[in-house]
From Swiss-Prot:
Family of this protein: Belongs to the universal ribosomal protein uL24 family.
Gene3D superfamilies: 2.30.30.30
Gene this protein is translated from: rpl24
The keyword Phosphoprotein appears for this protein: no
Biological role stated in the UniProt entry: One of two assembly initiator proteins, it binds directly to the 5'-end of the 23S rRNA, where it nucleates assembly of the 50S subunit.
Name of the protein described by the UniProt record: Large ribosomal subunit protein uL24c
Compartment(s) of residence: Plastid, Chloroplast
Species the sequence originates in: Pyropia yezoensis
Alphabetized Pfam families for the sequence: KOW (PF00467), ribosomal_L24 (PF17136)
Single Gene Ontology MF annotation: rRNA binding
Keywords: Chloroplast, Plastid, Ribonucleoprotein, Ribosomal protein, RNA-binding, rRNA-binding
Subunit organization: Part of the 50S ribosomal subunit.
Main location: plastid
GO biological process: translation
Amino acid sequence: MKGPSKTTKNNTKIKLKKGDLVQVISGSDKTKTGEIIAIIYKTNKVIVKGINLKVKHKKPQQEGETGEIIKFEAPIHTSNVMLFSEQNNIASRSSVIINDKGQKIRKLKKTGELIK
């Protein structure tokens, strides 16, 4: 087995990859950009660095221990993020092209910029 399936429960393929630069297009963090840290294929969500921060209060477990406040990135649905071009400051959908060697390369539709 190769690893986790790239499709979700409803068989939609996630076109984003770990390390992609994305912009949030809806919600409280709208227009913020960040890098994808993780992809959760089962729920069709991504975790973006520094975006959708949530706070968790942890109680002390033992006597003499202090409680703490933990900040963490919560997952965002893939429909709420879009690939982002840093050169042109534009969010865009992606398409796949096949080069001369037969390799698949992702490309931004609005700018034509190739994605690594």
